[in-house]
């Protein structure tokens, strides 16, 4: 039963764009499920481009197309721009701004502070090179790290963080039937194992190490395949494609480019591998989706990914080590079907307990009410909303 509020809590979500499926999809999942009896959500992004922008529009909430950050150098000009942002935020008049801008910008936080608006940010990556992150953190009313190592490395001793990992829609990734169209398109009939990775092809994702690891085990199998799903319009991707041709693996390694429906790709995979470099990740959603889809998964032993494999340590491999990746592929191939099925079932249960979208929404809503209460002193008991 929902307790009726005299005023809904107005939340403005800021996000650079809806180009990136991970970030955009995460925000759409949150807004589509947040309790509209209690919260009044809005979006601000920089432009209308991006595969998911139309999906965001279908949420039927106000979307502001505007800049919400400003360069802070030179300082005087930066402060002038911040005051302009202050006017923009005051016109929208949210109670809370939740920033999904994952850069180290602090102009947005400063403008919110000057406007008297509570400001929250989600920390998605393991970057912390500049002093700007410290200023951003100082100005925030609450911080949402996405893995335990962020807490220990960046926020130890702070009381204003809430560890809230990304959640996924379990129903979307359960009982997926094998996509025969993809099987035929990529000539996967009688291929084993079919290895899948989903990541934009940029250096931090370590795809070159995955390719080298695949090359080490290629001759151990009659017809294995590696499918690389993700944005491949980059110089790094072009370099990898040349490398694959030089290795004479272009009939075994498939670059699909960016795909809007990654769900179908899980249906054709035997193994999922995320080979990110030692820099680490925030909380890669592709690993969660793979596990929820019933695909046995392996990942680099790095921050972010380590959290997601905390109950499966033998499914982690040394980052930037092709030999270690090759060993995990062989580890999978030597498993009995009984062992594979057991591990897959445990993975699914782990995701259900720890990474469901319902868990994420519940914890976000509790945080919003806590931050709002600190502003308005309403003493609203969020548990009464259920």
Task: State what each model feature region is.
Residues 45, 296-299:
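Short hydrophobic beta-strand element within catalytic cores of glycosyltransferases
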Residues 311-323, 331-337:
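Conserved acidic donor-binding segment of nucleotide-sugar-dependent glycosyltransferases
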Residues 43-50, 168, 198, 225-239:
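Glycosyltransferase donor-sugar binding loop
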Residues 99-105, 123:
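Short His-centered aromatic/hydrophobic patch
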Residues 235-238, 250-259, 265, 316:
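Active-site donor-binding acidic/aromatic loop of nucleotide-activated sugar
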């Amino acid at each position: 039963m929902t307790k009726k509020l005299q005023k809904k809590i107005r939340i403005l979500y800021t996000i650079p764009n809806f180009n990136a499926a991970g970030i955009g999809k995460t925000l759409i999942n949150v807004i589509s499920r947040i309790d509209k009896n209690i919260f009044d959500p809005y979006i601000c992004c920089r432009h209308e481009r991006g595969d998911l922008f139309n999906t965001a529009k279908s949420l039927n909430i106000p979307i502001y197309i505007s800049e919400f950050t400003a360069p802070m150098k030179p300082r005087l000009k930066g402060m002038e721009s911040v005051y302009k942002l202050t006017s923009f935020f005051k016109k929208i008049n949210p109670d809370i701004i939740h920033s999904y801008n994952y850069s180290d910008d602090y102009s947005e936080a400063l403008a919110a502070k000057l406007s008297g608006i509570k400001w929250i940010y989600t920390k998605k990556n393991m970057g912390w090179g500049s002093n700007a992150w410290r200023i951003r953190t100082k100005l925030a009313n609450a911080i949402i790290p996405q893995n335990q190592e962020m807490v220990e490395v960046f926020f130890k001793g702070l009381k204003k963080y809430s560890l809230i990992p990304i959640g996924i829609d379990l129903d979307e990734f359960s009982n997926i039937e094998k996509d025969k169209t993809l099987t035929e398109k990529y000539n996967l009939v009688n291929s084993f194992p079919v290895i899948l990775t989903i990541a934009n092809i940029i250096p931090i994702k370590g795809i070159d190490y995955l390719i080298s690891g695949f090359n080490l085990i290629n001759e151990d199998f009659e017809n294995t395949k590696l499918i690389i799903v993700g944005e491949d319009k980059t110089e790094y991707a072009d370099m990898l494609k040349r490398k694959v041709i030089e290795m004479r693996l272009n009939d075994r390694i498939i670059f699909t480019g960016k795909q809007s429906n990654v769900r179908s790709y899980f249906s054709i995979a035997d193994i999922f591998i995320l080979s990110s470099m030692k820099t680490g990740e925030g909380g890669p959603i592709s690993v969660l989706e793979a596990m929820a889809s019933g695909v046995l998964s392996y990942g680099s032993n790095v921050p972010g990914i380590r959290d997601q494999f905390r109950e499966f340590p033998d499914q982690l491999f040394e980052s930037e080590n092709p030999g270690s990746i090759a060993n995990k592929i062989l580890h999978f191939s030597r498993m009995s079907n009984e062992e594979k099925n057991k591990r897959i079932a445990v993975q699914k249960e782990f995701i259900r307990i720890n990474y469901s979208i319902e868990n994420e929404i519940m914890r976000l809503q509790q945080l919003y009410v806590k931050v709002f209460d600190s502003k308005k002193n309403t003493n609203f008991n969020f548990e009464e909303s259920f």
